[in-house]
Amino acid sequence: MSLLTEVETYVLSIVPSGPLKAEIAQRLEDVFAGKNTDLEALMEWLKTRPILSPLTKGILGFVFTLTVPSERGLQRRRFVQNALNGNGDPNNMDRAVKLYRKLKREITFHGAKEVALSYSAGALASCMGLIYNRMGAVTTEVAFAVVCATCEQIADSQHRSHRQMVTTTNPLIRHENRMVLASTTAKAMEQMAGSSEQAAEAMEVASQARQMVQAMRAIGTPPSSSAGLKDDLLENLQAYQKRMGVQMQRFK
C-alpha cells in the first residue's frame, strides 16, 4: 500500500458515512493526484462543511496543507489550529512536545507511526498542531505517520465498545482500505484500457466499481460489506489482462 493510499484510508475511516464522505474522498484523491492545487479554496470549503467534528476538520486541513504545494508564508488557518490544540489540556501539550522531539529523529513513516501509537489521540492532535505551526521541522512522511496514528486511535475508540478482533487492524480501517484499493484498481483498469477493442468492457467494469464505492460511502455500510470488493475487481482486471496478453503484476 502506497503512503498516500494509507493516509487516505486512515483519514476516511474517521469521517461519518454520507454524501459528504464520498465528496471528501474525491477531494483527497484529487489533492494526492496533484489535480487540486488551490489550497485557499480547499480550506474555505472544508471550514464550512457541516457534520464534521472540529478535530476531523483539523486533521483534513492538516493533510491538505501538507500535500498541496503552497507559498512558504501562507497564513495558518485558525480553525485548524484550534482543533489541534489538544483540547487546551496542558498534559496533552507536554506529551506532544516530547513526541515532537522524538519524531524529529525519525525519518521513516512506519518508524514514526510506531512511536506515535503509544500516545493518546489528544497528545497526537497537539503534536499535529506543533507540526502545523512549524511545518517543515519533520519530514512529510513523519507528519503523515502522526495523521494515521491519530486516526487509528480515534477509529479504535469509536469501535471499542463492540470490538472483538483477532488482528490489531480496526475493521473500520480495513473497510475503508478495501474501498480505497478498489478505487485504485479501477483507475488502473481505466489506464490500461486505452483504445483497445476490450476498452469499453474494462471502462464499464471500472466505472461500476467506482460508483459502488461512492454509493457505499454515501449511504454508509457495515465493515463486512466491502469484503471481496477489491478481489472481485482484481479478478476482472486479471481476466482482461489475459485477453490482452499483458501482465500488470504491480496492480495486485
UniProtKB/Swiss-Prot annotation:
Localization annotation: Virion membrane; Host nucleus
Keywords: Host nucleus, Membrane, RNA-binding, Viral matrix protein, Virion
Bridged cysteine pairs (disulfide): none
GO molecular function: RNA binding; structural constituent of virion
UniProt keyword Phosphoprotein present: no
Residue segments, region RNP-binding: 165-252
Gene Ontology annotations for the cellular component aspect, listed alphabetically: host cell nucleus; membrane; virion membrane
Region: Membrane-binding, residue numbers: 1-164
Misc: Most abundant protein in virion. When expressed alone can form virus-like particles in transfected cells.
Subunit structure: Homodimer and homomultimer. Interacts with NEP. Binds ribonucleocapsid by both interacting with genomic RNA and NP protein. May interact with HA and NA. Cannot bind NP without genomic RNA.
Family the entry assigns: Belongs to the influenza viruses Matrix protein M1 family.
Name of the protein: Matrix protein 1
Gene: M
